[in-house]
Amino acid sequence: MDITKLINLFAKLPSLGPASSRRIVLHLLRHRQDVMVPLAAGIRELEMHTKECTICHNLDTISPCSICSDKGRDQSIICVVEELGDLWAFERGRIYSGVYHVLGGALSALSGIGPEDLNLGGIVDRIRTHGVKEVIVATSNDMDGQVTCHYIAQMVKGTDAKVTRLACGIPLGGEIDYLDEGTLRAALSSRYVIT
């Protein structure tokens, strides 16, 4: 393969431009045995063994994935996320012990993404067959995320599960003076009782 072609392939990855891609390729060329060979083998193995979970659409080496298969997880709570990276953010924080449902995006009229383009189908089935009590909608706090949240709430309406949405507002360590009006409004309406 041509070196320039490899640089261009790396540049297609998120957050990597031509300069960063060039540095990565040069590093790989200088460290063929200790970096390039294991990296290539790892990518090949990942491509061969990664599966999409038939339940939640997570990616893992097994299906159902290790999260859906974990008997220690609370199967009565489903956290609906837009993307796989969102699931991994929750897992990294070790702040959630339920199961997930990865949509693969958000509804977007501007981008032409409708319900048929997302992994929405299994949510209601999971609620009915697994005794789900709560669906946490953890979509982005933008217009597309809010539309997606509303759509999911309508889907779930005829079931016994309650639908909750992540609170939004002041970030941890954030100063009120630096917040925009929308964030401050969201924080004010999401307030909770302390005493």
Curated annotation (Swiss-Prot):
InterPro entries: DNA_Rcmb_RecR (IPR000093), Rcmb_RecR (IPR023627), Rcmb_RecR_Znf (IPR015967), TOPRIM_dom (IPR006171), TOPRIM_RecR (IPR034137)
First and last residues of each zinc finger (C4-type): 53-68
Keyword terms: DNA damage, DNA recombination, DNA repair, Metal-binding, Zinc, Zinc-finger
GO molecular function per UniProt: DNA binding; zinc ion binding
Domain Toprim: 76-171
GO biological process assignments: DNA recombination; DNA repair
PANTHER family attached to this UniProt entry: RECOMBINATION PROTEIN RECR
Protein name: Recombination protein RecR
Organism: Anaplasma marginale (strain St. Maries)
